[in-house]
A protein has these predicted regions:
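Extreme N-terminal basic, low-complexity initiation segments
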Residues: 2-15
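Active-site-adjacent structural elements in enzyme catalytic cores
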Residues: 13-330
Length: 330
């Protein structure tokens, strides 16, 4: 078992998560058993909280779609414990293996031809001949995956179209009543969904920007091609997605009357102001984005204005989520 899994040196029945609170090993086993029985599990990852189910069980996968109100043409990402398991499920070429070596465990999803259709059922793949798969970087989720042994589909634990939950409280508020087991792994370190790339015939295509940036990917596989027709192979591509109840206005220099404001960089504190990063740090802004959208929405504003975010590095992923929250992507 890898170093991110259970630490047997810590004493019987305990796991340590990110150096924070100790997590009881029986809870990990309880989650694995719930998955094996066809139940849903609220699961932390480094990106966002997920609502997980056995990827091979069509009834369990259908329960996720029902819990989220998610369109069934939208494929789900399969999560596995290690690259060896991923390579048994998906057909990886040298480029996919290089990406896995560079970025796993971590926030990168690879779309590749399906090798073992029984491991990730047709419903989870939206009837496609490909599978979206990743090895998450959160020790608690990897411990559950190792105990379960198979693939777990785990879309964000929110109602479809809403901002993804990056705290346990927000995840429980969204879909906690649907889960047989709910695991608290603390705030999500990354705060944005994984980057998604398609590694099929032709050049590697960027289907969804995320925490692994374009520059980091191109350092491994060379120039990336646009998504084109392969966009349907990735989740998170709906025109209106990640949206709070209040309308979102992006690239705003200042809030209008009645609007909450998501600032970036130097901006005075004030009522209804939520600063994604006072220092202009894109990683901090990404980690805060969904939580601050939710916090702003709870003030019941006339709208939520968002300051301009540099469209470079991690900013590409932040702006993708903001454009979809505002309904500007078709």
């Amino acid at each position: 078992m890898g170093g991110d899994g259970p630490d047997r040196r810590q004493g019987e029945g305990q796991l340590r998560h990110h150096g924070q609170a100790e997590i009881e090993a029986p809870r990990v086993l309880e989650a694995a058993r719930a998955l094996a029985a066809g139940g849903l599990v609220l699961l932390p990852t480094e990106t966002v909280y997920g609502l997980g189910a056995d990827a091979s069980n069509p009834a369990a996968v259908a329960a996720i779609f029902e819990a989220k109100g998610r369109p069934r043409f939208n494929p789900l990402i399969a999560h596995v414990h290690d690259v060896e398991t991923a390579a048994r499920i998906a057909a990886f070429d040298d480029r996919a293996l290089a990406l896995a070596a560079a970025f796993w465990p971590g926030p990168l999803t690879i779309v590749a031809p399906i090798r073992d259709p029984a491991a990730v059922c047709d419903l989870a793949r939206a009837g496609l001949d490909t599978v979206a798969i990743r090895v998450p970087g959160h020790p608690l989720s990897r411990a559950v995956l190792a105990a379960f042994g198979g693939a777990v589909v785990a879309p964000s634990a929110n109602r479809s179209g809403r901002p993804s939950p990056t705290t346990f409280a927000d995840a429980v508020a969204e879909t906690g009543d649907k889960a047989a087991v709910a695991l608290d792994g603390g705030p999500c370190a990354v705060g944005l969904e994984s980057t998604v790339v398609a590694v099929l015939d032709g050049p590697v295509r960027l289907l969804r920007p995320g925490a692994v940036t374009r520059a980091q990917l191109e350092a491994v596989v060379g120039p990336l091609a646009p998504a084109d027709d392969d966009a349907k192979r990735s989740p998170g591509r709906l025109a209106l997605h990640y949206a709070p109840d209040a309308p979102v206005r992006i690239d705003a220099d200042a809030p209008r009357a009645g609007e909450a404001f998501l600032a970036f960089g130097a901006w005075p504190d004030g009522q209804g102001v939520f600063n994604l990063s006072p220092t202009g740090d894109l990683a901090e802004a990404a980690a805060n984005l969904f939580a601050f959208l939710r916090a702003a929405d709870r003030t019941q504003p006339a709208g939520i204005a968002v300051a301009p975010i540099p469209d470079e590095g991690l900013g590409e992923a932040i702006n993708d989520r903001l454009r979809r929250a505002a309904g500007f992507v078709g």
